[in-house]
């Protein structure tokens, strides 16, 4: 009986062959029905399941004769990327061999997908009667409990066709227990096939399978996971319960649980972060190794939840991040530390902003040749009025609101009272934030911190050590030994590349929060690219369950600002929209924020600046000094207003004249009307009266800390807080963040847009 059963799965005589490998033989390498697994032999059995592939996956599988381990008559090789898979199965018999190849594609998401595969054969195709064919597949996973799938395999002539269906249930909505069944029927009349069984995952990386077949045989299988690798085996038993043969498989790819960690807990690990270079919101698809804020936040959160991670070691040498991003990372690290995990930070040369970030460490290491500068904060500008007067360029500032100061550097030779007042308030808030958090984390009295800033300012290494600003003087290459001293136990340092995200094995399309970035000046086709941004917001609103708009913009033109604000308002009527303000979200940057269901800002964010301003530069002798003259004809009383000398080599176009009194009155009317409209829209978006907004407008900028107090911002926090608020408003769980990959086409669009 044992030998007879093995022959059933060996290659039968040529007259029993089909033009493609039947479903029953394809499933021989699977521990379960196609739908009971995550990816269905990486698209070979059902190409639609390529939707579940998250990275490079490779597998080698083979069957053995009784009493043997080496491949016997059948083996397969499978490889896949997201939405793309290739596989082959080689079969041998009667001294001959053939190979069947399949290249598959998929579309859709994790809830519903379709796929198409093209198949062809090589080797002794005539003897085995193999032919080219195609396979259509689909699956439906409406929830984490249910999976249904179907495939149709056919020759291109449609002379031979086979349909297969599978159904799987996870009663606990997780991979811990799965029941499955499948059925295949050759439409051309071959014998039907069915099977049923279950998968029991005992611990991460250890799973048992059992499967009953229509011919009254059974298989028992084991999956032993090693993280990025799996060892799989199943043994087939005949109707009498005797061992018949076995199949084996080796998988290399995504993280799927490590049985060794279950049996033998690994050494405590420290995540090693090298923050050299710029930290950005986004990076280019190619040739850009920048780290992004959302990736770092997600990485730290994963490490916080991982019981094997005991701490983080950070090399902050050469770190470049704006103060708001640095604060967000600092807050995330503070949460990490609150879970009883250690943070070790290495610095070499830092100013007060860099030291503010680094002071979150439990143990702060300064390079023996390094330096700390606690110089405080300063804001100042260069004023060009005197130079413009000498050059013969006139400039008139159309300023009707006390704090709207964008153009004053051209119209004045010193800071206005309004500018001085608002900048001083910004610096005071920034300093108080740094003093409070540094003093708390370094166990200093605020008065002592003030003394260090005002009386010493710049600290050499031993001075910093004696002042309690750092805990040790050492180089980065000594950090491993330092951690060993701190932990008094063996540990392992791992890099982010050695700490990949585990594969998401949950069925069904997860609800999504889209992050849309509004970065740069408010302009139509540069800066934040308003034309494209409006479409991005609409697309995100259609496809996601909630939208987070990340704003980092100093403002700019009214038109693009208003277009984006209207897009946010429209989306808000359909889905929750939460605004996360970065370092600057002022003027037009605040306008595009105002319609959010909630606005989140960091305490050191610069926001507000609700106002409108303009200015006018004109010839006041420069043209004559350099020997130029202009002439013109016109129709229309004011047609000559923008006309003047042009210097194309330096891109200068300077109008010949200033505005007349009537023209100035008209311009003032326009600016005041735009301002009134701005104030009214902010009042509507923030659900406040016009008088309430007028009292805090006039073009004044505020820190995020003050903006919460006056009602321009709802909550202090960063991007992660905004995401969690969006999840709450959409009714989604807030405990898991998974960064959605950017499509290749979108990455190409970003690169091309940056080059044009």
Where do the protein language model's features map onto the residues?
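Extended hydrophobic-aromatic, low-complexity segments
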Residues: 191, 207-210, 219-222, 231-232, ...
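C-terminal structured "cap/appendage" subdomains that terminate the fold
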Residues: 699-746, 750-756
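Short active-site oxyanion
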Residues: 36, 40, 57, 207, ...
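Amphipathic alpha-helical substructures
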Residues: 446-466, 472, 687-717
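Subset of outer-membrane beta-barrel
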Residues: 17-249
């Amino acid at each position: 009986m044992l030998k007879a059963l093995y022959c059933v799965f060996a290659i039968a005589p040529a007259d029993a062959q089909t033009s493609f490998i039947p479903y029953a033989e394809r499933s021989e390498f699977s521990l379960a029905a196609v739908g009971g697994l995550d990816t269905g032999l990486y698209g070979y059995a059902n190409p639609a399941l390529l939707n579940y592939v998250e990275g490079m996956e490779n597998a080698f599988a083979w069957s053995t004769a009784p009493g043997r381990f080496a491949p016997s008559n059948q083996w397969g090789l499978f490889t896949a990327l997201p939405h793309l898979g290739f596989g082959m199965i080689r079969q041998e018999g009667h001294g001959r061999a053939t190979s069947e190849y399949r290249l598959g594609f998929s579309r859709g998401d994790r809830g519903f997908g379709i796929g198409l595969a093209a198949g062809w054969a090589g080797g002794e195709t005539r003897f085995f009667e193999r032919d080219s064919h195609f396979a259509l597949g689909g699956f439906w996973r409406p929830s984490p409990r249910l999976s249904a799938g179907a495939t149709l395999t056919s020759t291109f002539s449609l002379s031979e066709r086979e349909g297969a269906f599978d159904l799987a249930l996870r009663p606990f909505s997780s991979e811990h227990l799965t029941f499955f069944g499948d059925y295949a029927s050759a439409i051309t009349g071959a014998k039907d096939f069915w099977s049923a069984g279950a998968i029991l995952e005992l611990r991460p990386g250890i799973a048992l399978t059992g499967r009953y077949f229509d011919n009254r045989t059974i298989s028992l299988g084991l999956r032993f996971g090693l993280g990025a690798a799996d060892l799989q085996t199943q043994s087939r038993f005949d109707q009498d319960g005797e061992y018949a043969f076995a199949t084996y498989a080796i998988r290399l790819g995504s993280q799927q649980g490590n049985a060794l960690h279950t049996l033998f807990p690994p050494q405590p690990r420290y995540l090693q972060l090298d923050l050299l270079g710029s930290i950005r919101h986004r990076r280019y698809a190619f040739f850009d190794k920048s780290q992004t804020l959302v990736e770092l936040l997600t990485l730290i959160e994963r490490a916080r939840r991982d019981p094997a991670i005991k701490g983080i070691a950070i090399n902050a040498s050469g770190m470049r991040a704006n103060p708001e991003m640095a604060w967000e990372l600092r807050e995330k690290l503070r949460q990490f530390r609150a879970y009883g995990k250690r943070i070790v930070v290495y610095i070499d040369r830092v100013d007060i902003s860099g030291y503010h970030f680094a002071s979150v460490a439990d143990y702060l290491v300064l390079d023996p040749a390094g330096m700390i500068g606690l110089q405080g904060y300063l804001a100042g500008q260069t004023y060009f009025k005197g130079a413009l007067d000498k050059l013969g360029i006139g400039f008139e500032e159309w300023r009707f609101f006390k704090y709207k100061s964008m153009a004053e550097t051209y119209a004045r030779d010193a800071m206005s009272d309004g500018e001085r007042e608002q900048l001083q308030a910004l610096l005071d808030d920034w300093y108080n934030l740094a003093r409070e958090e540094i003093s708390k984390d370094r166990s200093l009295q605020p008065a002592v911190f003030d003394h260090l800033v005002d009386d010493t300012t710049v600290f050499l290494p031993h001075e910093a050590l004696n002042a309690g600003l750092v805990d040790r003087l050492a180089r980065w290459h000594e950090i491993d030994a330092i951690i060993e001293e701190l932990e008094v136990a063996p540990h392992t340092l791992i890099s982010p590349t050695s700490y990949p995200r585990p594969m998401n094995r949950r069925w069904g399309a997860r609800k999504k929060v889209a992050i849309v970035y509004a970065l740069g000046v408010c302009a139509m086709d540069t800066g934040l690219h308003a034309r494209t941004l409006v479409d991005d917001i609409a697309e995100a609103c259609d496809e996601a369950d909630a939208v987070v708009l990340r704003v980092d913009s100093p403002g700019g033109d009214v038109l693009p600002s208003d277009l984006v604000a209207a897009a946010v308002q429209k989306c808000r009527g359909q889905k929750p929209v939460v605004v996360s303000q970065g370092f600057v979200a002022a003027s037009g940057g605040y306008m595009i924020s105002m319609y959010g269901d909630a606005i989140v800002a960091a305490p050191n964010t610069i926001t507000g600046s609700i106002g409108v301003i303009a200015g006018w530069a004109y010839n006041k002798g420069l043209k004559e000094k350099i020997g130029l003259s202009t002439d013109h004809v016109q129709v229309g009383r004011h047609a000559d207003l923008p006309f003047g000398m042009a210097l194309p080599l330096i891109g200068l176009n300077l109008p010949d004249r200033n505005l007349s009194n009537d023209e100035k009155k008209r311009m003032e009317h326009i600016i005041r009307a735009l301002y009134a409209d701005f104030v009214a829209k902010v009042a509507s978006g923030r659900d406040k009266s016009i008088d309430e907004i007028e009292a805090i407008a006039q073009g004044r900028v505020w820190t995020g800390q003050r903006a919460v107090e006056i009602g321009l911002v709802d909550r202090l926090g960063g991007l992660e807080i905004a995401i969690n608020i969006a999840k709450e408003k959409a009714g989604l769980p807030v405990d898991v963040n998974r960064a959605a990959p950017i499509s290749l086409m979108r990455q190409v669009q970003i690169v091309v847009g940056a080059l044009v």
